[in-house]
């Protein structure tokens, strides 16, 4: 019977030591959750960078293989046109913002400030 109590004490101490390592030791549950969050953030960043890389790779391929991409870039970025081609630039009017009347100035034309109740 004495051996049974000794074994129970050893198992309780072992359980206590394992719990301490789980909660406070290296690689504890808090660190694991923090690392999982970092992995999630890094995977999201990697996905965005992969999409950017795919778009750049497609653009490089298009520039190597097709003349239309080179022509489009020359037109939009460098302002080039083909010989004999006419270039028309359409300039849109700037939006007109209505002028707000100043404080104490009546909103209707022809009213005198003394006439306003």
From Swiss-Prot:
Gene Ontology BP annotations: FtsZ-dependent cytokinesis
Cystines in this chain: none
Transmembrane region(s): 7-24
Recorded topology in the membrane: Single-pass type II membrane protein
InterPro entries, A to Z: Cell_div_FtsB, FtsL/DivIC
Alphabetical list of PANTHER family matching this protein: CELL DIVISION PROTEIN FTSB
Lineage, highest ranks first: Bacteria, Pseudomonadati, Pseudomonadota, Gammaproteobacteria, Lysobacterales
Pfam families: DivIC (PF04977)
Tagged with keyword Cell membrane: yes
Coiled-coil segments on the chain, per record: 29-69
Lipid metabolism keyword on record: no
Cellular location(s): Cell inner membrane
Keywords: Cell cycle, Cell division, Cell inner membrane, Cell membrane, Coiled coil, Membrane, Transmembrane, Transmembrane helix
Purpose: Essential cell division protein. May link together the upstream cell division proteins, which are predominantly cytoplasmic, with the downstream cell division proteins, which are predominantly periplasmic.
Protein name: Cell division protein FtsB
GO cellular component, one term: cell septum
Gene this chain is encoded by: ftsB
